[in-house]
């Protein structure tokens, strides 16, 4: 496992400038690996942080075509070609606070090239079709800008971007037409051209930052087509099959055999939750490509929990998301799992919920069961962990096929951290408690420390009574329990 994370879009540009008490509490909830005096975690220990590299819509104001000032971004590049390293200060504050709390993997992602380079002079795709909103003569300029951002953040903030993503959801059928946010579509051929330009720019500057592609909007665009044509589908085959001569990136410096995709729209019905991920993994395995799930939140088709509208601090959303995490890891083989926005508003897209004044200059932040549910994974399954297979048996000792996954009952995954500790994450989706017995073939493991997330005050990775290895334990109804070996 490579880690668990979230992104700073777009709230951190504001919250990062709020009073210290709010900023520090927010950072602790997201990144801390410390415990209180009773052994209860203070935060969820995210190990990956996505930084949105702005395109410059902020300075355009309403002329940007983006309605909300919350979703407009600044840009390090000035119109005259010089750089302004005072830009995006709130986000950069969170970069530093993340690093201070142990985060080591930082991803810089673009929703749009800088507005100075785009076809329409905007960071949205308004008035255009399904191709990249970038002038042909500016591919190299965009790549050089990305290289300068990598250098600038390290020089000014001490932050090393491990990965940079040139595009975000380029296969989205809505084509990123405003007025909601920055974005651009792109064909596979255009993405390959961008990746090669980024590779050349990074190589010339001696940067070892990796180029991550292609942040697909839907898993089905990665191994097939979905609501677009072939030019924006079959991403895995396009970039990692040598027969795809125009788009093959398997021998491009700085481009790892790693695909990033988003699990939006594929979480219901329940059979699709499994089958789509199995098709994805089959294709990834065929071309020897690893996979990161880098973004998701609750959308309108997630009807089981009422869709995305209206924030929910309860276990209803937390368990629904835990089920997605389980399936992405078990059936899609995700080595990393990342939520969309770390902090959001009155929508189910934030781990935390912000309440701000109209100007966005002050406010407060509250936690949610969703935050702590992700923490059942992120706080204990650390970078470098190996996911272990699980053999499940019934009461007679007979093996149960896929016994680690009951979509309406218990779902279990197991890991071994690099330090030798074992971790078992158990999700109980059912409305009644479930009994189970488990053990590992490791003589050093004598007992397990469970951490419970459930409805109720204080039940946020709450340490409860230890369990002996091989002894029966009870998983409370509608809860998530992580067991850590002792």
Where do the model's predicted regions map?
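Noncatalytic carbohydrate-binding groove/subsite architecture in carbohydrate-active enzymes
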Residues: 151, 181-324, 331
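Carbohydrate-binding surface patches
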Residues: 397-444, 478
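Solvent-exposed beta-hairpin/edge-strand motifs
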Residues: 441-460
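C-terminal beta-strand-rich structural cap/linker in extracellular carbohydrate-active enzymes
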Residues: 463-486
């Amino acid at each position: 496992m490579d880690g668990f994370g979230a992104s700073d879009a777009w709230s951190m540009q504001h919250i990062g400038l709020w009073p210290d008490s709010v900023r520090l509490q927010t950072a602790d909830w997201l990144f801390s690996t410390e415990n209180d005096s009773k052994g209860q975690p203070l935060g969820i220990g995210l190990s990956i942080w996505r930084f949105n590299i702005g395109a410059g819509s902020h300075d355009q104001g309403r002329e940007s075509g983006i309605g909300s000032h919350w979703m407009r971004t600044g840009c390090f590049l000035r119109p005259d070609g010089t750089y302004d390293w005072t830009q995006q200060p709130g986000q950069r504050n969170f970069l530093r606070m993340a690093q201070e709390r142990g985060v080591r993997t930082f991803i810089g992602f673009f929703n749009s090239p800088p507005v100075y380079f785009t076809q329409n002079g905007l960071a949205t795709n308004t008035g255009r079709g399904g191709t990249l909103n970038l002038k042909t003569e500016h591919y190299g300029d965009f790549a050089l800008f990305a290289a300068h951002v990598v250098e600038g953040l390290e020089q000014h903030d001490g932050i090393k971007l491990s990965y940079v993503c040139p595009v975000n959801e380029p296969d989205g059928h809505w084509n990123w037409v405003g007025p909601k946010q920055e974005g651009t579509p792109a064909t596979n051929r255009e993405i390959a051209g961008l990746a090669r330009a980024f590779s050349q720019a990074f190589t010339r500057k001696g940067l070892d930052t990796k180029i991550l592609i292609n942040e697909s909007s839907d898993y089905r665009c990665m191994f097939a087509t979905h609501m677009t044509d072939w030019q924006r589908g079959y991403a895995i085959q396009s970039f990692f099959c040598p027969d795809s001569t125009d788009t093959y990136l398997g021998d491009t410096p700085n481009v790892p055999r790693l695909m990033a995709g988003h699990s939006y729209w594929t979480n219901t019905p329940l059979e699709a939750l499994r089958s789509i991920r199995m098709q994805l993994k089959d294709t990834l395995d065929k071309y020897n490509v690893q996979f990161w799930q880098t973004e998701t939140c609750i959308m309108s088709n997630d009807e089981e929990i009422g869709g995305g509208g209206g924030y929910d601090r309860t276990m209803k959303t937390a368990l629904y998301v835990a089920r997605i995490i389980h399936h992405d890891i078990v059936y899609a083989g995700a080595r990393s799992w990342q939520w969309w926005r770390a902090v959001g508003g009155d929508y189910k897209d934030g781990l935390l919920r912000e309440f701000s004044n109209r100007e966005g200059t002050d406010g407060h932040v509250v936690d949610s069961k969703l935050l702590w549910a992700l923490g059942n994974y992120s706080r204990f399954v650390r970078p470098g962990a190996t996911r272990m297979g699980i053999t499940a048996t019934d009461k007679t000792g007979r093996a149960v096929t896929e016994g680690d996954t009951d979509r309406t009952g218990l779902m279990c995954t197991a890991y071994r951290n690099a330090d030798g500790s074992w971790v078992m994450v158990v999700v109980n989706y059912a409305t009644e408690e479930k009994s189970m017995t488990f053990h590992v073939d490791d003589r050093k493991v004598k007992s397990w420390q469970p951490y419970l997330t459930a409805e109720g005050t204080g039940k946020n990775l709450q340490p409860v009574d230890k369990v002996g290895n091989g002894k029966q334990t009870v998983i409370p109804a509608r809860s998530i329990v992580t067991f850590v070996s002792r």
